[in-house]
Amino acid sequence: MKNGGSMQVQMKLGVMMRDLLQVEDEAWGLYAFSRDILNRRILPETKTEMIAKANACGKAYAQRIIREYGTRDVRVIADKLKLKLEFQSALMTGKRVLFACYTPPYTIEIMEEPVRRAAELVQEEEQALVELFQQAGIMNTILGHEIFHFVEDQFAHEIYTRTEKILLWNLLGFKNYSTIRTLSEVGAMAFTQELNRLSYPPFILDVLLYYSYDAASAEKIYRDVLGVSSGRCREPVEDY
């Protein structure tokens, strides 16, 4: 009974991963926007432009780091940047599992248990997926993502993901602007994809890493992403 149930779960994961591998970068960015508190305050065409710029930003800064340090190895880069890496088993925040965290100025925490569990799940899938999602590769992808957030801090005055802002309110000549969290995430994904020479969008790890903890939530992410990708999910834009 346990073996049969396990096989059913594994097959389901494989189907989701294969579908998600076909999703374009723009759709992943729109999915990320759909979870952003500022989502409805930005026009659809503006989001598309922002996503493209954030992707270009992430890739450009990855190439800059590669040129400066002469390597794509994220562990070596982290060492050269004087980052302190801490590896934990797992960390819960409310009902959610935290996979990694950058704490300024120099600390990156990565949770090893979710990565191990994800890699073990993939082992039961077809060889093409096994090769894409090795444990070491997943770990390097996550590390690259967090390194980008450090890079953002270092170049906050010029990096697109920090300089692009949205006007929150304008009262009696006083204006309040906010950065857009989604752009930081899109940039980080593009950065680690470029550093690690990934053939897949790193956003897909949101599904893979969650799956061993909460398959229902992972499936919801999967369906939401496909909904955005197909154009079925449209949200109104607020007037402000």
Language model segments and positions:
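Active-site recognition of the HExxH zinc-binding catalytic motif
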Residues: T141-E158
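Conserved binding/catalytic microenvironments
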Residues: T103-A119, Q134, A156-I159, K165-I166, ...
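A metal-dependent hydrolase signature that marks the N-terminal structural subdomain at the beginning
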Residues: M1-L121, Q127-A128, L132
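Residue-level recognition of short, structured coil/turn motifs
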Residues: G70, A156-Y160, R197
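Long, positively charged binding patches that form subdomain-scale interaction surfaces
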Residues: E126-I142
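Metalloprotease/metallohydrolase-associated module, dominated by Zn2+-dependent proteases
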Residues: T163-Y240
